[in-house]
Amino acid sequence: MKEKYKVTGQLFLLSNLPICCFILKDISLVYARLLFVLFLFFTLYFSYKISIKHNVINRIHKLEWNKVLYCLAFVALMRLTVHLYLSSFGDTQNDALLQILKDIMGVELFNFYAIFVGPVLEELTFHGAIMNYCYNMSRKGFIISNILFGFMHCMNEPSIGIFIRSILLYSLLGCIISYIYYRTKRIEYSVLIHMLANFLAAIDF
């Protein structure tokens, strides 16, 4: 089990590596953005290599259209959940942090990261590594992976009450995504639903 935790830790550290470019001191924003792009491709490549080497996920195969349509229905469910939450409680602290990142990165680079790169790295770490690799798609793995997924998206909330309702929101979204992974046993479908959900959030749909 130690080896599995080690691999999961490697994937987690890699997934956060690109963002570190923007906390470096004495480096211009232009160079930080260039370094960020380089780190994105570096991180994607090595995260996938590690995942395949240790059987965290299966190799990627061509998508099946019936399963893609299945994913679209769950994307709609995710957006409905988010809209209900926002209409009741307003934006989360995670939304505010994402806006800060967007201002630093620029809209185009931020959207590329949020829509295409972030979902891949998060799915490999939380659902590929934790739910599947560490806990073999068990109920325990399902619960742990989605609580951690929720925690990572709301650890900066200003009060315990807001934190609790935010972690419930993001954990529920994680559950919807991981249910797709559980049913299909293919990480590309959970990545797809995650990408589509982030795309709709990016265009404020």
Report each predicted region and the residues it spans.
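Alpha-helical transmembrane segments in multi-pass membrane proteins
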Residues: 4-51
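Alpha-helical transmembrane segments of multipass membrane proteins
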Residues: 14-22, 39-43, 74-82, 122, ...
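Juxtamembrane "helix-exit" motif on the non-cytosolic side of transmembrane helices
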Residues: 19-28, 82-92, 154-158
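Residue-level signature of transmembrane alpha-helical entry/exit and packing/kink sites
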Residues: 7-11, 32-37, 63, 67-71, ...
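Membrane-interface helix-boundary motifs at transmembrane edges
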Residues: 26-29, 54-65, 129-137, 181-185
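Transmembrane helix-loop-helix hairpins at the membrane interface
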Residues: 107-205
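Non-cytosolic membrane-interface motifs at loop->transmembrane helix junctions
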Residues: 29-36, 95-102, 161-172
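Juxtamembrane helix-loop-helix connectors linking adjacent transmembrane helices
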Residues: 53-118, 161
